[in-house]
């Protein structure tokens, strides 16, 4: 009874078993709503599982590997590029440039695709460049905000310890905010999966799960569409979980001051 009250109490802290039970109940409710949904066009779980089995026999696994590797590559390149640009804002020369780049997140890729096509030397390079651009403009914005939000006291403490300005940058901004890099990465890495369908729809030569999804959607096979979407969701959750595990392993101190861990 105490746990039943606690889940609706503000700032309540539940133990791990209670959290697992709460999640299990909520998942069960979602599944029941799905099974007994009155919407005729909404595929039932059995239909989705059957469609997934058929897609798997047709090579969905290989397409998932292709898309996953492309997304990982795009995230890796985006992370390196965005961090270099964000860290460069410690120098006044680069601040207007990064501010301008961050505003590009408001643009649509429609129209810009033509220019990326002219610059790319292959279909894979075109897909990669589109994904890197889509993720980087958000990533660099988040990291620039993290750097701008570093308290003045941290800089003063480093200077009091007689550190040079480049040492201050290394200790306060690079090492001192490394845990927040994982948070920003976690938030923006999902952008790659959101853009994947469009990117793989533009370049179909290498296949990918986005190509399969577009084909199934074109023929209005809703059960197959749901099966692919749920598979992408599970892959995204695995990616998100992996980034969280990496953060906890490399930055175990990050959660010490948090009330909800």
For every predicted segment, state its role.
Residues 1-24, 241-261:
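Transmembrane alpha-helical segments of polytopic membrane transport and secretion proteins
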Residues 129, 133, 166-199, 231-234, ...:
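Transmembrane alpha-helices
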Residues 142-181, 210-213:
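Short cytoplasmic-facing helical segments at TM-TM junctions of multi-pass membrane proteins
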């Amino acid at each position: 009874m105490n746990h039943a009250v606690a889940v609706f109490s503000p700032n309540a802290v539940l133990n791990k078993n209670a959290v697992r039970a709460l999640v299990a109940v909520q998942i069960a409710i979602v599944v029941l709503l799905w099974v007994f949904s009155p919407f005729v066009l909404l595929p039932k779980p059995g239909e989705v599982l059957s469609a997934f089995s058929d897609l798997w026999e047709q090579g969905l696994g290989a397409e998932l590997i292709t898309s996953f590797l492309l997304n990982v590559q795009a995230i890796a390149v985006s992370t390196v590029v965005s961090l270099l640009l964000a860290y460069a804002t410690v120098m006044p020369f680069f601040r207007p440039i990064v501010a301008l780049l961050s505003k590009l997140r408001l643009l649509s890729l429609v129209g810009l695709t033509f220019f990326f096509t002219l610059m790319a030397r292959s279909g894979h390079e075109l897909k990669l460049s589109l994904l890197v651009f889509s993720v980087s403009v958000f990533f660099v914005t988040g990291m620039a905000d993290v750097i701008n939000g570093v308290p003045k006291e941290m800089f003063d403490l480093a200077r009091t310890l007689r550190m040079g300005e480049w040492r201050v940058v290394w200790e306060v901004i690079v090492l001192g905010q490394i845990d927040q890099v994982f948070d920003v990465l976690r938030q923006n890495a999902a952008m790659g999966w959101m853009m994947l369908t469009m990117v793989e729809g533009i370049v179909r030569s290498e296949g990918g799960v986005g190509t399969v999804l577009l084909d199934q959607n074109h023929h209005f096979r809703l059960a197959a569409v749901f099966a692919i979407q749920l598979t992408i969701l599970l892959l995204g959750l695995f990616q998100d979980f992996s980034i969280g595990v990496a953060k906890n392993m490399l930055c175990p101190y990050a959660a010490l001051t948090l009330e909800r861990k």
